[in-house]
Every structure is written in C-alpha cells, then in structure tokens.
C-alpha cells in the first residue's frame, strides 16, 4: 500500500493553493466542500476565482510564490503549468514537513486526491495511487450507480441515535445486533421515501421494545427487457429483496440481477395462462410482507401501465402493508425507441394513445371513433390475438387502410423483431410472420420512419404488398 487512506478534517484549517487558473479552481471546489480556509497565490487569477474571493470564500495573494507563503499551512497544492514552480513548491513544502500535492505529477505528491463518492456524511474514496486516475474515476462512476442517495440522510438519522443506543445496550455485540436489525428494517425505506419523521419514530420504537420484523413490498417496473434500461432504484431494491415475485414478461437477463439468495416465485401472466390467479397473487404479497419479508414484485414495463400494479397496491394499502412503487420504462416508449419509431413527430403525430387489446371480458368497448382519428399514434399492448378485431374496427371507423403499422416482437431484447406494413394487412402480417407475445403494435404514420431511423437489431421485415392498399376510409 503506497498511500495510507485517511480522512482529514479541514474545517477552517489553512490550505495553500499555488496557481490561479482552471486547475486551481477545480482543487478549490473540493476544498470548499470540506470548509477549508483557502489561500491562493499567483500573479493573476481567473474570473471564477476572483468571484469566489469577492464572496469571501477564498483569499487571493497577487504575488509569485515564495517560501514565506508556506507559513502555518497544513496542506499545499501546486496547480500551475510551470514545472519549475511546481518543483519549487514541492521541495520547500517537503523541507517544512507540510503535506504537498503537485497536480498530475505523482512522484511529487506526499498526498493525493482520490475519486470521491459523496453521500454526506458517508464518503467513499477510490485511489489508484496516482497510477491510473481514469480507471479510478470509472470505478467511482460504477459505485455512484450502486449507492443510493438516501444513504447520507440515513447515516445522519442513525448518527443521532448513537448515544441512546450506547446507553440502552452496554455490550458491543448487542449494539451491533441492534444496528443490523435497523438496517434490515423499513426504517431504511422510510428514509428513502422522504418520511424521516416516521423513520425516527420507528427507531425509537425499536430502541424501547423488541419489535417484530416489518415486511414491505416493492412494486417494481423492470422495463421492456433490456437490463440496461432498469432504473437505479429498481436494481437496488431487487438486490435487497428476500423474495422476488415475477411474471413471464420479465426477461431472464433482468432476473439474473436479483439477489442471489432470494426466493423466486413465478406467477405466470400470459394470455390464457395465469398460473396464479390475480387475487391469489395479491394475497401472497400481503402474506409474505406480514411474515416480515422484503418482497420485490417485479413486472415487465411499468407496473401502472397495463401491469395491474394498481390493483395490487390497492390490496397492500387496504391491508396496511408498507410498499414502494418504482416506475419502469413502459413498452411503448422502450420498444418504439429501439425500433427507431418516434411516438410523436411534428410532421406525423401530435397525439398518442396507449391502448390494451386485453380488456376485462365484461369491460366497456374501446372508443373506436377516437382511436381512428388521423395525426395520432396508437400504441397497442397485448394486441396480437385481437389484431383482426382491432384492424376491422379502425377501418370501420375511418382510419385509412394505408396507415403504416409496425409490430415489435421482444422489443429491446437481443431477439427483437420488427415487422412493418399497412393497417389493412395487420392481422395477415401477424399470421404470416407467426408473431408471438410479448409484442407491441404501433399504428400511425410514425411507423414509416423505422427504415430511416433503424439503429438496433435487424431491420424490419416489410410487407410483401408492392402497391399501396386501396383506401377503404
């Protein structure tokens, strides 16, 4: 280990920065976060540093560097583009036993700046000992995606309870067990959702009584299939869950990202094949949460867009089960983007309607008159089986038979397939190409842009019709 990682409290401590340009400005930004007392010395300064001085955030000395500037300094940073000046700063600081950093010159550093993940008061520092700063930055970027923003407020909250916990539990092992229970409880999720008052109340309760484990359900949208389209929050909750309840629409690649030791429960959901009835799924979520489990109810797309997430959350709320809702990229947005089809376009579509082809058996019929209007895009979920009916009703209510359509099968996934054609042949396209779910139907002029804007996967299989279809509008 070339450098000992330590954290230094610089609050009002004197720090010298030699230099007056952009590099010096960057170093000042980090030092100001630590509330250091910063003095800069240089013959001239950039405008941003002059503005900081006018706000009394830094002190500027318009002089060339000399040994006298080192007096009483705790740290020194050389941030000039003059090698001989940087060397002079290093040698004199070393002679006075002052820690010194020469920017981008690792051999002339007795301390270095790490890459930082800041979740105040939690701070994570990553260093390559000056050998590969770009690699250290990339590691920081990875950690930024994995460490949620609420970690900082959580640390602040529990920090306020440390003395109470020490009074309550005299032995270290007991205190450690208590804190493990806190971080496994819904105190964390309450902070995450911004309800710090409820989190504090629960902490007080846990401190004064032996609380039963409190379960919670995360209703998570997994997006259309590509695991890189998951939100950070979805990934974090997937990796916290004790139990994962999922549908067939959730891709295998996404399921690979759940916590390794979590129990996996598949509840089906294909047309005509509901391996678990919806009401049974609802009750299962309640029962698991009442057992103190953290349950991730993961759904393809967005849970509140044709995912029956609203029904499940209603049951959770009625049973007073804690829950969180994590939106996902809905199929219409994700699949159309991966097919190079903008859902709206100034020249083609000023409106969009999301439609399901799988309504309740006794449900109200769709407003076909509205759906058949021109200059709009229809994004139809679960419409493969009902495509003959969809086609017939749109034509019957005046939509042009030559209206472009696109069928996106397994959108955003490695096996994505796009089939394009005209509304008048929609059902035939699906039959001839043996389209299977999950598939999204896009109906509207924007579907014609696929060939021009294609970027992912194979280009569309186009209609075999050489001539435009007869306008039956």
Swiss-Prot record:
GO terms, molecular function: NAD binding; precorrin-2 dehydrogenase activity; sirohydrochlorin ferrochelatase activity; uroporphyrin-III C-methyltransferase activity
CDD domains, per the entry: SUMT (cd11642)
Keyword NAD assigned: yes
GO biological process: one example: methylation
Residues noted as binding NAD(+) in the record, renumbered to the chain: 22-23, 43-44
Uroporphyrinogen-III C-methyltransferase: region residues: 215-473
Keyword Magnesium tagged: no
Catalytically driven reaction(s): uroporphyrinogen III + 2 S-adenosyl-L-methionine = precorrin-2 + 2 S-adenosyl-L-homocysteine + H(+); precorrin-2 + NAD(+) = sirohydrochlorin + NADH + 2 H(+); siroheme + 2 H(+) = sirohydrochlorin + Fe(2+)
Gene3D superfamilies attached to this UniProt entry: Cobalt-precorrin-4 Transmethylase, Domain 1, Methyltransferase, Cobalt-precorrin-4 Transmethylase, Domain 2, NAD(P)-binding Rossmann-like Domain, Sirohaem synthase, dimerisation domain, Siroheme synthase, domain 2
Entries under Pfam families matching the protein: CysG_dimeriser, NAD_binding_7, Sirohm_synth_M, TP_methylase
Pathway terms, separated by semicolons: Cofactor biosynthesis; adenosylcobalamin biosynthesis; precorrin-2 from uroporphyrinogen III: step 1/1; Cofactor biosynthesis; adenosylcobalamin biosynthesis; sirohydrochlorin from precorrin-2: step 1/1; Porphyrin-containing compound metabolism; siroheme biosynthesis; precorrin-2 from uroporphyrinogen III: step 1/1; Porphyrin-containing compound metabolism; siroheme biosynthesis; siroheme from sirohydrochlorin: step 1/1
Enzyme Commission number: 2.1.1.107, 1.3.1.76, 4.99.1.4
Region (Precorrin-2 dehydrogenase /sirohydrochlorin ferrochelatase) residue spans: 1-203
Family, as annotated: In the N-terminal section; belongs to the precorrin-2 dehydrogenase / sirohydrochlorin ferrochelatase family.
Function: Then it catalyzes the NAD-dependent ring dehydrogenation of precorrin-2 to yield sirohydrochlorin. Finally, it catalyzes the ferrochelation of sirohydrochlorin to yield siroheme.
Name the UniProt record assigns to this protein: Siroheme synthase
Annotated source species: Pseudoalteromonas translucida (strain TAC 125)
UniProt gene name: cysG
């Amino acid at each position: 280990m070339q450098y000992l990682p330590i954290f230094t409290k610089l609050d009002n401590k004197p720090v010298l920065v030699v230099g007056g340009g952009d590099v010096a400005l960057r170093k000042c930004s980090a030092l100001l976060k630590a509330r250091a007392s910063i003095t800069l010395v240089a013959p001239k300064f950039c405008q941003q540093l002059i503005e900081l001085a006018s706000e009394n955030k830094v002190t500027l000395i318009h002089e060339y560097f000399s040994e006298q500037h080192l007096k009483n300094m705790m740290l020194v940073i050389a941030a000039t583009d003059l090698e001989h000046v940087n060397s002079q700063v290093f040698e004199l600081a070393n002679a006075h036993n002052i820690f010194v950093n020469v920017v981008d010159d690792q051999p002339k550093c007795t301390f270095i700046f790490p890459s930082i993940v800041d979740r105040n008061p939690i701070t994570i520092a990553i260093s390559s000992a000056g050998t590969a700063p770009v690699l250290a930055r990339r590691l920081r970027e990875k950690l930024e995606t994995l460490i949620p923003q609420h970690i900082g407020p959580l640390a602040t909250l529990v920090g306020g309870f440390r003395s109470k916990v020490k009074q309550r539990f005299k032995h270290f092992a007991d205190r450690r067990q208590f804190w493990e229970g806190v971080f496994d409880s819904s105190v964390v999720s309450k902070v995450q959702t911004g309800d710090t008052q409820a989190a504090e109340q629960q902490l007080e309760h846990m401190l004064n009584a032996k609380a039963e484990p409190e379960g919670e359900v995360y209703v998570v949208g997994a997006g259309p299939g590509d695991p890189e389209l998951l939100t950070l929050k979805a990934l974090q909750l997937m990796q916290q869950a004790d139990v994962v309840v999922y549908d067939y629409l959730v891709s295998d690649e996404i399921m690979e990202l759940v916590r390794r030791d979590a129990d996996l429960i598949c509840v089906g959901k294909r047309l005509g094949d509901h391996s678990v009835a919806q009401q049974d799924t609802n009750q299962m979520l309640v029962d698991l949460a009442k057992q103190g489990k953290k349950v991730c109810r993961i759904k393809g797309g967005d849970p509140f867009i044709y995912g029956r997430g609203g029904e499940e959350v209603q049951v959770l709320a009625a049973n007073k089960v804690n829950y969180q809702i994590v939106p996902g990229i809905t199929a219409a947005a994700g699949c159309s983007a991966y097919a190079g089809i903008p859902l709206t376009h100034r020249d083609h579509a000023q409106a969009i309607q999301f439609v399901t082809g799988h309504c309740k058996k006794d449900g109200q019929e769709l407003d076909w008159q509205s759906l058949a209007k021109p200059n709009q895009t229809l994004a139809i979920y679960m419409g493969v089986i009902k495509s003959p009916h969809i086609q017939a009703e749109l034509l019957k209510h005046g939509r042009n038979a030559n209206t472009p359509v696109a069928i996106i099968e397994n959108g955003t996934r490695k096996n994505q397939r796009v089939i394009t054609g005209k509304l008048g042949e929609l059902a035939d396209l699906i039959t001839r190409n043996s389209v299977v779910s999950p598939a999204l139907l896009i109906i509207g002029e924007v579907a014609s842009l696929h060939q021009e804007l294609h970027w992912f996967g194979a280009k569309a299989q186009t209609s075999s019709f050489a001539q435009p279809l007869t306008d039956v509008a």
